[in-house]
């Protein structure tokens, strides 16, 4: 489902380096303060853009230097994610991970004593998750069986940008959240320094899998429409480094580790003043709660 009718400003043209090699425009939506990938694939055609050994978010094995960095960073970020969630809730809270992939975060939360389950559209990812621990990750249709106002926390770790109908999904997830509950939403930030540096080669544009590209201003507007508000934000420090590493390959045809480390360092350094980190986690609550 198309979210916007006002894709009214060409911003950049990007290539799908990971899978298809196709070119897509990024158009700035002045009313929403965000970018939209244009044209957007039909929902039925989206899955083909995820069917590649180069697309690693659902992968199990290391095949390259970037894969090794990705898996190492994932371990560190899961610890940080658990820390952010635990700062709001005691053990035993109910956590729904929307877009759970192969279930790493769900299993980690369960190991910490939380009641946690995941929802995931990709059947292969669900099969991997449930082979490690049965009945951990379910098809997204399972959302209809979840009781309203039953979840202490709902997490979307780099998921929102993939959702064709993200506003409808957020509205549905809001109904599942307890009055005192929180949404934890991580998204890339196209206003970051590393995005500006790499331009069309910035790996976090990841067209056309990333249908939307958010700014802090866009996130404030989105949740204001839902009668929710951003309570706080957390920087995802490591994203600047591994996104920069993959971006160097898109830019030059090979990984440039030292350049990636330098650009990642500069991005995080500049963000200490601007707040524009490569990726941000938004902690969102119901207004007046």
List each language-model region with its residue ranges.
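A C-terminal cap/extension of S-adenosyl-L-methionine-dependent methyltransferases
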Residues: 11-21, 232-289
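Short loop segments at secondary-structure junctions
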Residues: 32-33, 41, 217, 286-289
């Amino acid at each position: 489902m198309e979210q916007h009718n006002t894709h009214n400003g060409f911003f950049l043209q990007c290539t799908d380096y990971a899978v298809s090699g196709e070119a897509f425009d990024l158009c700035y939506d002045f009313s929403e303060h965000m970018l939209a990938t244009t044209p957007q694939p039909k929902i039925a055609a989206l899955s083909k853009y995820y069917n590649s050994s180069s697309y690693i978010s659902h992968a199990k094995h290391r095949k390259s230097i970037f894969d090794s960095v990705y898996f190492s960073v994932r371990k560190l970020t899961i610890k940080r994610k658990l820390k952010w969630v635990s700062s709001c809730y005691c053990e035993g809270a109910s956590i729904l991970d929307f877009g759970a992939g192969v279930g790493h975060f769900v299993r980690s939360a369960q190991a910490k004593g939380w009641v946690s389950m995941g929802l995931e559209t990709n059947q292969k990812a669900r099969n991997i998750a449930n082979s490690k621990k049965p009945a951990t990750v379910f098809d997204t249709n399972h959302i209809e069986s979840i009781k309203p106002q039953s979840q202490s926390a709902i997490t979307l770790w780099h998921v929102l940008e993939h959702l064709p109908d993200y506003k409808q999904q957020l509205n549905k997830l809001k109904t599942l959240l307890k009055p005192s509950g929180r949404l934890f939403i991580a998204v890339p930030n196209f206003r970051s320094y590393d995005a500006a540096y790499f331009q069309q080669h910035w790996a976090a544009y990841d067209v056309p899998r990333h249908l939307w590209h958010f700014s802090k201003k866009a996130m404030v507007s989105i949740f204001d429409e839902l009668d929710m508000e951003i309570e706080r934000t957390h920087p995802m420090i490591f994203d600047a480094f591994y996104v920069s590493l993959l971006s160097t390959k898109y830019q030059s045809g090979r990984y440039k580790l030292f350049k990636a480390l330098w650009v990642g360092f500069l991005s995080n350094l500049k963000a200490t003043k601007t707040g524009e980190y490569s990726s941000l986690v938004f902690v969102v609550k119901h207004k007046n709660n």
